[in-house]
Amino acid sequence: MRYYVISDVHGYYTQMKSALEKAGFFSDTTPHKLIMLGDLFDRGHEAKQFQQFILEQMEQDKIILIRGNHEDLFVELVTTDAGMPYSYHKSNGTYDTALQLTGFDPVMASIRHYDFADAAKDTPFYKEIIPAMLDYFETEHYAFTHGWIPSIPNRDKSYSYISSWREADREQWNQARWFNGMDAAQTADENKTIVCGHWHTSYGHSKYEHKGSEFGEDADFSPYYGPGIIAIDACTAFSGKVNCLVIED
């Protein structure tokens, strides 16, 4: 099977579609699927178009959805926080995503926050897309996840491998979605190459390959390849790019 892997689109549908076109996803006549490594929305302004695209791929059984930390934030916004416009929901872009998907007026959303939350719960994103998301997906040689697989973070900022990560509970997966895979991979001992997103790849190129800076003119947002890891988050809001990895396995 051929897999087209994309991560952290964050609502930049046009850039995502361009990356898929360049990789040959739409013209591919062989068996293939799209793998989305989470963080679908919360930056760009094309949430509705992207939502429709995902629903179409789901209907055709051509997409595998991995849950990211921003999906967790959306659920938190519309359930625990009842649609309240807390500052971190705004700074993370989650509040704006809910506004886009519901069509709510920003002023009315802040006043009628319970109605706003109910409207967000009635979106296909909340009712259909998020419930279809997996913590991870694996093939013979690869495991696909958002941040990293559940591990034990140590005080020195290293990570200790957990052999039973597949049996991890909800809390462990929620935590792992926030991990920087490029740091976690330095101590991981898994037999599969882990393909992840969440953290901008310029970090790995800069810190571990000593190539360019994280956010300067010389920053490299291409996929990062290291022992046991392929990281693909291009930090689209900053770079304007979306990485598309093509894997056959």
Q: Which residues does each predicted region cover?
A:
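N-terminal active-site segment of His-dependent metallophosphoesterases
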Residues: 1-53
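Residue-level marker for buried hydrophobic side chains located in beta-strands
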Residues: 5, 34-36, 65-66, 143, ...
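Divalent metal-coordination and catalytic microenvironments
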Residues: 8, 39, 68-69, 97, ...
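Short, glycine/acidic-enriched loop or turn micro-motifs at the edges of active sites
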Residues: 10-11, 42, 71-72, 149, ...
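A general structural motif
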Residues: 29-31, 60-62, 140, 189-191
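Conserved beta-strand scaffold positions in the cores of enzyme catalytic domains, especially
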Residues: 43, 65, 194, 229-233, ...
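Active-site neighborhood of divalent metal-dependent phosphoester bond hydrolases
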Residues: 43-135
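Acidic, His/Gly-enriched loop-helix segments that form or flank divalent-metal centers
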Residues: 107-230, 236-240
